[in-house]
Swiss-Prot record:
Function: Essential for recycling GMP and indirectly, cGMP.
Main location: cytoplasm
Every Guanylate kinase-like domain range: 5-184
An annotated GO cellular component: cytosol
Listed name of the protein: Guanylate kinase
Species annotation: Bacillus licheniformis (strain ATCC 14580 / DSM 13 / JCM 2505 / CCUG 7422 / NBRC 12200 / NCIMB 9375 / NCTC 10341 / NRRL NRS-1264 / Gibson 46)
Annotated TM spans: none
Family annotation (Pfam families): Guanylate_kin
Signal peptide annotation: none
Length: 204
């Protein structure tokens, strides 16, 4: 009896380091997650590649995906759309592999409704001052955009109660270790492993 994969959702405020932590996790040899690439209408940042970091789409293309129910979740954030392609997620979970989503908070709340059995991890900054510093250091945002992101971040931190776990990103290495420990523990939950053992007893 093949165990269905876990849907692991990592989200948190803009600038908290979701992408950096995800890249560090996937660079480790013992990471066995399948990364679900999000679709977005925002412009690529320096070094980002289409089909690797995101699927970059026009607003028209994205809205067509919404109409055709091709997205597990989608949200508009600071003037851009973000979403998760549904077919890939479902097929991967059925094959027994874990799917890792790195998405915005609005999107994570939608996924929570569609996949309540998912594993929801909130990546938190050590402080709001550090969060602002990380956004400013990017060098890609205007002052107005930075203020909008900070306002949104405060609202998103208040939504922490919708998550199963909170991981502080005070160190990328420690954040990765905490996430791996959470996933390991979830795979050992009685309600996930008991059916396999009960099936084994039936065969005996």
């Amino acid at each position: 009896m093949k165990e269905r994969g876990l849907l692991i959702v990592l989200s948190g405020p803009s600038g908290v380091g979701k992408g950096t932590v995800r890249q560090a996790l996937f660079a480790q040899e013992d990471t066995k997650f399948e990364y679900s690439i999000s679709v977005t209408t925002r412009k690529p940042r320096q070094g980002e590649r289409d089909g690797v970091d995101y699927f970059f789409k026009t607003r028209e293309e994205f809205e067509e995906m919404i109409e055709n129910n091709k997205l597990l979740e989608w949200a508009e954030y600071v003037g851009n759309y973000y979403g998760t392609p549904v077919d890939y997620v479902e097929q991967t979970l059925e094959s027994g592999r874990d799917v890792f989503l790195e998405i915005e908070v609005q999107g994570a709340l939608q996924v929570r409704k569609a996949f309540p059995e998912g594993l929801f991890i909130f990546l938190a900054p050590p402080s709001l001052a550090e969060l602002k510093n990380r956004i400013v250091t990017r060098g890609t945002e205007t002052e107005a955009t930075i203020e909008n992101r900070m306002k949104a971040a405060k609202e998103e931190i208040e939504l922490m109660d919708a998550y199963d776990y909170v991981v502080e990103n005070d160190s990328i290495e420690l954040a990765c270790e905490r996430i791996k420990a959470i996933v390991l523990a979830e795979h050992l939950r009685r309600d996930r492993v008991a059916p396999r053992y009960k099936k084994m007893l039936e065969v005996e």
